[in-house]
């Protein structure tokens, strides 16, 4: 089980990301617009850098929905490998079973 504070910190980051996503995308699209002057684009970069760091998507860590474990995460199930193994073994996840050859 991951520390509750780590999980909460990550949730806070994802909420902030969702809140500022459109603003960040708009700034980035204007920054890459070659029709604007260099000075205007530089000012937009400064505006982007003034946004909170935690509003960036790279600051969000994928964590298991069950345990909060940050490693061995499967995006399809939003679970870590340990929990997937337990649930697949007990037949709770439909269509998933232990391989054998």
From Swiss-Prot:
Keywords assigned: Ribonucleoprotein, Ribosomal protein, RNA-binding, rRNA-binding
Single Gene Ontology BP annotation: translation
GO cellular component assignments: cytoplasm; small ribosomal subunit
InterPro entries: Ribosomal_uS14 (IPR001209), Ribosomal_uS14_bac/plastid (IPR023036), Ribosomal_uS14_CS (IPR018271)
Protein's job: Binds 16S rRNA, required for the assembly of 30S particles and may also be responsible for determining the conformation of the 16S rRNA at the A site.
Assembly and binders: Part of the 30S ribosomal subunit. Contacts proteins S3 and S10.
PANTHER family, sorted: 30S RIBOSOMAL PROTEIN S14, SMALL RIBOSOMAL SUBUNIT PROTEIN US14M
Protein name, UniProt field: Small ribosomal subunit protein uS14
Source species of the chain: Orientia tsutsugamushi (strain Boryong)
């Amino acid at each position: 089980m991951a520390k509750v504070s780590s999980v909460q910190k990550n949730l806070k980051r994802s909420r902030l990301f969702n809140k500022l996503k459109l603003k960040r995308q708009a700034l980035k699209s204007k920054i890459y617009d070659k029709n604007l002057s260099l000075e205007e684009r530089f000012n937009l970069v400064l505006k982007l850098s003034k946004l909170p760091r935690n509003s960036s998507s790279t600051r969000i860590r994928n964590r298991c929905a069950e345990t909060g474990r940050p490693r061995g995460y499967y995006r399809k199930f939003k679970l870590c490998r340990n929990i997937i193994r337990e649930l697949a073994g007990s037949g709770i996840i439909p269509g998933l079973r232990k391989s054998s050859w």
